[in-house]
A protein has these predicted regions:
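Short capping/connector residues at structural and topological boundaries
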Residues: 167-169, 183, 221, 249, ...
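Short clusters of hydrophobic/aromatic residues that line enzyme substrate/ligand-binding pockets
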Residues: 162-164, 222-223, 244, 328, ...
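C-terminal active-site/capping subdomain that shapes the small-molecule cofactor and substrate pocket
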Residues: 29, 268-272, 281-406
Length: 406
């Protein structure tokens, strides 16, 4: 089977690395949608070298690895990477105009981050993720969370958000043609929430909050720039080189699509961008209803993660002391739990029963103050937001979907 990759940005390029290493797909067709440099040689150089992960040849075969991109044919737009035939398309940017059918591509991974609304018509002149289906693809993977622009419109029945190993069983090949692999942050967060959800249950999770200390992304500015017309968040135009920048994340909303039980739990998600190229961290804070006879302690939280990590390749449990560069390139790990920094504090939450009357709740007679034991747990989870965590997880999900295509 052939795989199509739309876009050659950070996730597109690293997805190409992943799949030429994995060699599940017989051929790969990459759509750039425009001319690059002086030709195919410059595209090959862009694929070979990476500022965060080094050379493709080293990634594939270690430091003694030789040239892995060969047989360049400018006229045909073809090359061979690690023995895998790769065709580069440089004509169409609108998904509906990409020649997937002409190249016998049945499955496409859209890594542009542009086409995220599955309700947009395939023929939209601005482009739509559905355009890939019109152009001949049967399945489309999206390397970003869905974002429906029009309010009040439900998610189409043929679209689904999944995280490999969390809810990928919800994918139905006969029903779903567009699959979002959520985001790097949602993927990491899923593996921080799921073990605790399985152990405690949703009824004991009172509230949750998280902040992702996130590496810079391509949407940010290298140097300060003048904002475009209509821009409301001026910080997005400030230099990423020397600033800590407050921004937003849709991880809380996307998490509810992956772990539905979280929809009933008050959850706040925030994001801070920092001047590093990759390697990010989630600080998760959970308030859990405790039991006096069996209080929740740090060791219990860590044992839950350690036991869960023994059952899956996607969660790593670390008893060491890591910094962000230690996480870069970590293979197939959605999350690395920094167990040395897990903390818990238990206190009595005092509820004034008189206040419940305004909620039409009969407090009855007796004490007017109810004390409920509550434990606040703080957990740290590392993730390589590019290759190590997200791209590898996306690659596994892509292969999983491909294996179920008839």
């Amino acid at each position: 089977m052939k795989l199509g990759i739309n876009g050659l940005g950070r996730i597109g390029k690293l997805s190409l690395w992943h799949h030429v290493s994995r060699q599940f797909f017989s051929e790969i067709v990459v759509n750039l949608g425009r001319q690059v440099g002086s030709g195919l040689e410059d595209i090959a150089a862009t694929i070979e070298k990476d500022s965060s992960y080094g050379r493709l040849s080293t990634y594939l075969h270690g430091h003694k690895g030789g040239r892995v991109i060969e047989n360049l044919n400018e006229a045909a737009g073809t090359m061979t990477i690690n023995g895998v035939p790769v065709t580069v398309l440089r004509e169409a940017r609108n998904p509906k105009d990409i020649k997937w059918q002409d190249n016998n591509v049945r499955m496409v991974v859209d890594t542009t981050g542009v086409f995220k609304d599955p309700t947009t018509d395939a023929g939209d002149p601005r482009g739509s993720v559905r355009g890939h289906l019109q152009a001949g693809a049967e399945k489309v993977m999206v390397s970003a969370p869905f974002k429906i622009k029009s309010k009040g419109i439900d998610m189409p029945d043929d679209a689904i958000t999944t995280v490999m190993g969390i809810n990928d069983d919800d994918y139905k090949p006969e029903q779903h043609s567009i699959v979002s692999a959520a985001s790097c942050t949602t993927t990491c967060l899923s593996y921080m929430i799921k073990p605790l959800m399985d152990h405690f249950g949703a009824d004991r999770m009172l509230t949750a909050s998280m902040v992702t200390v996130h590496a810079a992304t391509g949407s940010q500015k290298v140097l300060d720039a003048v904002p475009a017309a209509g821009v409301t968040d001026l910080r997005k135009n400030r230099s990423t080189l020397n600033n800590i920048i407050l921004t937003t994340t849709g991880a809380a909303k996307a998490l509810g699509l992956v772990i539905p039980e979280m929809k009933g739990i008050g959850f706040i998600a925030e994001s801070v961008r920092i001047p590093t190229s990759t390697g990010s961290l989630i600080v998760l804070v959970l308030n859990l209803q405790d039991e006096l006879e069996n209080p929740i302690k740090r060791d219990l939280i860590n044992s839950i993660y350690k036991d869960y990590a023994a059952t899956t390749q996607y969660l790593k449990y670390s008893a060491g002391q890591n910094v962000s560069s230690d996480i870069i390139g970590t293979p197939e790990a959605a999350t690395v739990i920094e167990s040395t920094e897990t903390h818990t504090r238990t206190a009595s939450l005092k509820v004034n029963l008189d206040h419940l009357k305004s909620c039409n709740i009969d407090a009855g007679s007796g004490p007017h103050i109810l004390e409920v034991p509550v434990t606040q747990a703080v957990i740290y989870g590392w993730y390589d937001n590019e290759l190590g965590s997200y791209t590898n997880m996306l690659g596994d999900l892509t292969v999983s979907v491909a294996e179920r295509m008839v």
